[in-house]
Design a protein with these regions (language model features):
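Extracellular glycan-targeting catalytic surfaces
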Residues: 14-212, 223, 250, 292-295, ...
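Short, contiguous, pocket-lining structural segments
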Residues: 165, 169, 190-197, 213-225, ...
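Active-site-adjacent structural elements in folded domains
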Residues: 95-96, 184, 188, 206-217, ...
Length: 394
């Protein structure tokens, strides 16, 4: 299949057998100028993986991802001792270079894949492949498929389960790989190697002590564990893990995280209740977007008392539309930066026939230059995601 023809076909593949609906058809021309402007800039940037950033405080090696817990600071009463926690206050001295490199990957590869799907121009797919080879294949630069040393805390631990959330940025990368592969833009041999990396990482998420610790977290961390395993299982064709994630969504996430009014009490209890509520809702919506099928539609699933995604969206949408109505505390940091173009509005609006949510999504800011916002807005290329139920991703 020629590259241009393959890219044109991707739109139909993403839309499912019935073809794209009116909103999906309107999305591609809406996104085209934004996507191409970004992708053209990214063509000038060469891949850079974690091996370019030595981490002196890491207990691991040069291929091991390392980060330090955001909210941990030196103890004034014991300056050389273990750090202490200050919830919601990020320590600017902590090591974040590996996270920044991963976020850069998650910004650039999906944009390049989206540009390829819109235009059929091989240069976009080829540059995306350069990044993918550097991160997941090349022996000299690849990242090891674990987060054993993520979110370390000085004087306390060399890594912990909480760090698993750092790889939420691989969710849209996995999607980009799938889109490129469906259109024949990733050679079979490369795809096998990329799949192998994600298969090994999924195994680590599911079996390691740190992975299991994050799985059992009761708030957005537990949500993001399911989202990641779902996305990576989708890429690798692991139907058993996909089904496990569907079951966990219905039996763990919705019952333990969602209140009767559609709020997330564990997020409201944090020092950034608005931002965390948006973040968790986007993660829940992304799980549904990845895993919902005609026979097991997570979008319409609800508990006997009515708790489900419809209620969660109905709770949060008014406060996205008019933040001044938010009745809870203001976020201690970055409060003025939210809301952004939240994926939950688009995904849920399309899946649950909430056109006002889709219209609202179109009015919101798509991109930010604020690092913390980029970090917490992990779905940035809707062209890669929109499809009717029952499509090859749905």
């Amino acid at each position: 299949m020629k590259v241009a023809a393959a890219a044109v076909a991707i739109g139909a593949l993403l839309a499912g057998a019935s073809g794209p609906g009116p909103e999906e058809r309107g999305l591609r021309p809406l996104e085209r100028p934004r996507v191409l402007a970004a992708a053209n800039a990214y063509l000038e940037r060469q891949p850079q993986t974690i091996t370019a950033f030595p981490a002196a405080r890491s207990a691991g090696g040069p291929h091991d991802f390392f980060s330090e817990g955001d909210y941990w600071w030196p103890n004034p009463a014991d300056p050389g001792g273990p750090y202490i926690r200050r919830d919601g206050e990020s320590n600017p001295q902590n090591f974040v270079e590996h996270r920044r490199a991963l976020i850069r990957l998650s910004v650039e590869v999906p944009a390049l894949a989206a540009a390829w799907s819109l235009t059929g121009r091989a240069q976009y797919a080829e540059h995306a492949r350069r990044h993918l080879r550097a991160w997941f294949i090349a022996p000299e630069s690849r990242m090891n498929p674990s987060l054993q040393y993520a979110q370390a805390i000085h004087g306390i631990t060399t890594g912990r389960g909480t760090g698993v959330i750092d790889t939420i940025h691989l969710v849209e990368v996995a999607r980009a790989v799938e889109v490129l592969r469906l259109g024949g833009a990733v050679p079979a041999a490369e795809f096998v190697e990329i799949q192998r990396w994600f298969r090994e990482y999924t195994r680590w998420l599911v079996t390691s002590p740190n992975g299991r610790e994050e799985r059992d977290a009761k708030n957005n961390h537990g949500t993001c564990w399911v989202m990641q395993v779902a996305a990576f299982a989708r890429l690798t064709g692991d139907r058993a893990q996909e089904q496990m994630c569907r079951t966990r969504f219905k039996t763990v996430l919705v019952p333990t995280e969602l209140a009767a009014d559609g709020s997330f009490p564990l997020e409201l209890a944090r020092t950034k209740p608005y931002g965390y509520s948006l973040f968790n809702l986007d993660a829940m919506a992304t799980i549904c977007q990845i895993l919902a099928t005609a026979s097991d539609n997570l979008w319409t699933f609800s508990l006997p008392d009515g708790r489900g995604m419809g209620r969660a969206l109905a709770f949060m949408a008014p406060y996205i539309r008019d933040k001044s109505r938010w009745p809870y505390a203001r976020d201690v940091e970055y409060d003025d930066e939210w809301p952004m173009r939240q994926a939950s509005l688009l995904f849920g609006g399309l899946a649950l026939n909430r056109p006002d949510d889709v219209a609202l999504w179109k009015t919101l800011k798509a991109d930010s230059s604020v690092d913390e916002v980029v970090r917490n807005l992990f779905i940035r290329q809707p062209v890669l995601w929109t499809q009717a139920p029952g499509g090859p991703f749905g």
